Amino acid sequence: MPRTQRNDNFIDKTFTVMADIILKILPANQKAKEAFVYYRDGMSAQAEGEYAEALDNYEEALNLEEDPYDRSFILYNMGLIYASNGNHERALELYHQAIELNARMPQALNNIAVIFHYLGDQAAASEDGEKAEQLYDKAADYWKQAIRLAPNNYIEAQNWLKTTGRSTMDVYF
């Protein structure tokens, strides 16, 4: 049964109805509309913690979607799932693919930085200071890129960059 027929959440149901109306009036081809349905169902499943179902829907959407910008968001959402499940390597691959298609995606840059920072913490905990510093430097590079794109966001990252001496910039815009 399609997710749209079993959605009991009022907000999700409202979103689904609105999305269906928009799909009917938008001048998009059938393939693009079908891709959006899979993407929408993927987002709904992801919100409910049904990650395997979400990934299946995102894969279908990715197979159908031709627009690079839209594909970037599908890849980004897939990266979120892999990151939340601890598969950082796959998440990094997907975030990088998303950025290749959409260079103005600060949230993907931020998430890459978060992963490198986490891995840096892991290296520090295992007393590999050199590796930790390398990973923290990578995190800093990605946070700087994200902050340049969205200077009012990522305040904690900006503070971390300043307190660790990894940034001499006071303002990113």
Curated annotation (Swiss-Prot):
One of its GO terms (cellular component) is plasma membrane-derived thylakoid membrane. Pfam families: TPR_1. InterPro entries: PSI_Ycf3_assembly (IPR022818), TPR-like_helical_dom_sf (IPR011990), TPR_rpt (IPR019734), Ycf3/AcsC/BcsC/TPR_MFPF (IPR051685). GO terms for biological process: photosynthesis. PROSITE patterns: TPR (PS50005), TPR_REGION (PS50293). It is found in: Cellular thylakoid membrane. It is a peripheral membrane protein. Keywords: Membrane, Photosynthesis, Repeat, Thylakoid, TPR repeat. Belongs to the Ycf3 family. Essential for the assembly of the photosystem I (PSI) complex. May act as a chaperone-like factor to guide the assembly of the PSI subunits. This is Photosystem I assembly protein Ycf3. The lineage of its organism: Bacteria, Bacillati, Cyanobacteriota, Cyanophyceae, Gomontiellales.
